[in-house]
């Protein structure tokens, strides 16, 4: 049976999805994949006459429900088509089902998915192999923000429109938070870096060996409140494994919900590794804990995830086995690019590449 992977490209307005889709099709088709792209359903509906800003509540509700049903039908239809092929298939969705929830009240969303016969967990956590969120140009790359590439866009290129776009960016990230393979793609000084990060993240999902890259990490102190952060509690356990292979179990708690993820990082050379990640059930999680590495302790930490000037940050406050360490990490920033530190962060030390501060080594029993 062929391999089928389904990912979502999402993000705020003017994030670069259209250009990224073209790159994805070209790149992975050249590697032998059949690439299907599911079009953005709300844009299709708007072009057909749907008005998402209507004051008619019944029309709005029925329209949003129809949008969801169409999205589900398109995805399921192309998945069935993919199953008939022998070559590996990559299905790329221009936005996914949870994007719809970002434009609804929580109660409206629960009512609609209840009528359709789905749960939040089924739609967010189980339908897709990865979610790639491209940060809007309205946050940190305002000079590139435009509405000319989508006539249906309502967020105009003025200060009010930019603020609306930033707020939508945040709501879309919140809608997908909890998915085990959510990746936020920063804005970059060079747009090609942003596109290359998309290709790298998809390659990881497909199990294609990737160059080993050091993410930028810093020991920091928090000097103020973190605005618009998404908070979660993480319990991380390392399992016993073969040499050059790191196996990690993670339980992440977010808004009273728990997600369990199994991750394997296998180094195949001095410069390349293969990383695989999958969501698992709570029962399998409990069972796999029996294979915990006896030489390592469980890590517990509180994470604040946030975007600042187009760059995505994760701020981890460690609670166990140490409780006086705070590490700030930002992903996908090229070496020649500068990190845009927020004013509420005080940097004590740059620890990029310092193996002492790898979680895997922090967990070592002393």
Placement of each model-derived feature along the sequence:
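A glycine- and Lys/Arg-enriched "phosphate-lid" helix/loop adjacent to the NTP-binding pocket
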Residues: 107-174
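Conserved substrate/cofactor phosphate-moiety recognition/catalytic segment
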Residues: 25-70
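Conserved lysine of the Walker
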Residues: 17
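The conserved Walker
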Residues: 13
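Glycine-rich phosphate-binding loop used to anchor ATP phosphates in small-molecule kinases
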Residues: 65-125
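Hydrophobic anchor at the beta1->P-loop junction of P-loop NTPases
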Residues: 7-9
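Hydrophobic positions on the alpha1 helix immediately C-terminal to the Walker A/P-loop
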Residues: 20
């Amino acid at each position: 049976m062929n391999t089928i992977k389904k990912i979502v490209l999402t993000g705020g307005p003017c994030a670069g999805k259209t250009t990224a889709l073209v790159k994805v099709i070209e790149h992975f088709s050249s590697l032998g994949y059949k690439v299907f792209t599911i079009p953005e359903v709300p844009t299709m509906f708007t072009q057909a006459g749907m008005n998402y800003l209507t004051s008619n509540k019944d029309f709005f509700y029925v329209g949003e429900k129809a949008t969801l049903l169409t999205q589900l039908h398109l995805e399921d239809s192309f998945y069935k088509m993919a199953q008939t092929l022998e070559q590996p298939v990559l299905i790329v969705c221009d936005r996914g089902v949870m994007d719809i929830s970002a434009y609804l009240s929580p109660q409206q969303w629960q009512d609609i998915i209840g009528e359709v016969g789905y749960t939040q967990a089924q739609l967010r956590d189980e339908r897709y192999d990865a979610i790639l969120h491209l940060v809007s140009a309205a946050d940190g790359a305002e000079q590139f923000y435009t509405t000319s590439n989508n006539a249906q866009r309502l967020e105009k290129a003025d200060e009010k429109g930019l603020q609306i776009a930033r707020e939508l960016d945040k709501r879309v990230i919140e809608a997908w938070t909890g998915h085990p393979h959510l990746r936020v793609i920063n804005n970059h000084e060079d747009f090609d870096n942003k596109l290359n990060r998309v290709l790298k993240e998809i390659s990881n999902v497909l199990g294609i060996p990737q160059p080993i890259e050091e993410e930028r990490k810093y020991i920091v102190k928090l000097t103020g409140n973190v605005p618009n952060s998404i908070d979660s509690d993480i319990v991380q356990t390392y399992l016993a494994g073969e040499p050059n292979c790191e196996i990690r179990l993670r339980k992440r708690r977010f808004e009273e919900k728990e997600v369990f993820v199994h991750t394997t990082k296998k180094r195949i050379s001095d410069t390349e590794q293969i990383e695989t990640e999958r969501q698992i059930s709570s029962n399998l999680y409990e069972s796999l804990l029996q294979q915990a590495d006896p030489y390592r302790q469980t890590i517990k930490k509180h994470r604040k995830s946030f975007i600042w000037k187009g760059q995505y940050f994760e701020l981890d406050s460690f609670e166990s086995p140490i409780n006086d360490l705070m590490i700030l990490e930002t992903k996908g920033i090229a070496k020649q690019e500068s990190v845009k530190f927020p004013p509420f962060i005080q940097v004590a030390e740059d620890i990029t590449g310092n193996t002492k501060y790898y979680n895997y080594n922090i967990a070592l029993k002393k």
